[in-house]
Amino acid sequence: MKFTARFAVTCVAVFAAPLAAQTETIDPVAEVEAQEERTSRIAQQLWDWAELGYLETRSTGLMQEELASESFTIKAGIADIPTAFVGEWGEGGPVIAILAEMDALPGINQSASASRDPVAGKHAGHACGHNLFAAGSLTAAIAVKRWLEKTGTPGRVRLYGTPAEEGGSGKVYMTRAGLFEDVDVAIHWHAADRNSAAARTTLANRSAKFRFTGVSAHAAGAPERGRSALDGVEAMNMMANMLHEHMPQDACMHYVVTSGGTAPNVVPDFAESFYYVRHPNPDGVDEIWVRLEAAAKGAAQGTGTQVEWEVIHGNNPLLVNTSLARVMDAKLRSLGGVKYTAEERAWAAEISKTLGKAAKPLDDAAKIGPFGKSLGYGSTDVGDVSYATPTVGVRTATWVPGTSAHTWQAVAASGHSIGHKGTQLAAKAMTLMAAELFINEGLRKAARAEFDAARGPDYKYKSLLGDREPPLDYRK
């Protein structure tokens, strides 16, 4: 299918301007296809490294090297984050940003096998597909650069290397630093078990580590001298669980105990819990948070301990932009879904057997989901970007249908050719979307008008993590 055919899907409906002859004949998708080997190579390398948030040194270095080889100008170490960067190519015209996440998750790893197969000595894995995210976004940015260059279209394409999405809120610090203020539109994508460009928002969230200190003592010889920090954690957890009953239906809260002592016969003088609170809007998070802090204070008072807490991260919900989402949906439909080879289908069938009732027909990978508005129950720091500039995203079937994020099945597919195929599809959709935005001023204006109306005339950006500095050691 020629670029002109793909473009016609949206050109009539969305404030189209006549295209220059060269933009009609140069197909941006071909620029993605020309990079297929590089896309898979980078995705696999990042999958092998599986670097954690704010520690993505090799991953970010590789991405910057690839951009530099394509004559992008690189600014590294931005927003006081050593692994964050912006690569830019072009001049004048609109500024279109493409976001690239790269961090892995701790505590889960897996080979690319279709059965459970942890890798000995490896303590992290790409269970959210950010190796694919990075590779696909890098490919799209380079494809857009080549298209701009060949067509002589004015404008700048930027790739934002955004670390620590998984609980580190890297994009929040980048937003707070004003790095998106001159961007016309930001484009992102994510690994998934389906293909969709629906206008899907997310939950606002905040996390913190609650640290209790007490007095150590012999648990049998002198228990009366001890003040158990673990008692403080447990008392707080009990009150938090009671709080669940009085939270709104669409809110949620979860926690883990990260430190609880080392020996049963020693009263622990230190204990720590790690909490997340989520709600569809930031004010809802704040209301629950006040009560959670009260639970922490009450637990300390009742157990004779002390407590302090550190906010680790916080994200605003995604501000959807329907004007952009409808166009992205049309681009995705013009491309179609993910087609498996016989070998890939056999591998996917084995994965599907491990999913139980969550399994879905393998043919779903080749389909495009319906367009509409929906609420996703996860959270992402893309939300803060979406309050700085109009933002649009897409999801593609990089995982076997029915696979959930943060599972070993997601790790396996993210290191498999199925994941690479979904990445290619995402790169093509983003490239088509960016090309449309560069030449369609009417679409850019419509997106900005919707964005301004959604934020409101008196909007002032507020970060849910406050004024803290990036927690560069939160994964150490």
Task: List each model region and its residues.
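Zn-dependent metallopeptidase/amidohydrolase metal-coordination segment
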Residues: 345-427, 445-475
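Divalent metal-coordination and catalytic microenvironments
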Residues: 46, 87, 98, 130, ...
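Acidic/His- and Gly-rich active-site-bordering loop/insert found
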Residues: 22-126, 131, 135-156
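Acidic/histidine-rich catalytic neighborhood of metal-dependent amide-processing enzymes
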Residues: 132-202
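Bacterial N-terminal signal peptides that target proteins for export
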Residues: 1-9
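His/Asp/Glu-rich mid-to-C-terminal helical/loop segments that flank catalytic regions of hydrolases
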Residues: 231-234, 238, 242, 246, ...
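Bacterial N-terminal signal peptides
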Residues: 8-18
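Midchain, well-structured core segments that form catalytic/ion-binding scaffolds
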Residues: 182-340, 344, 350-352
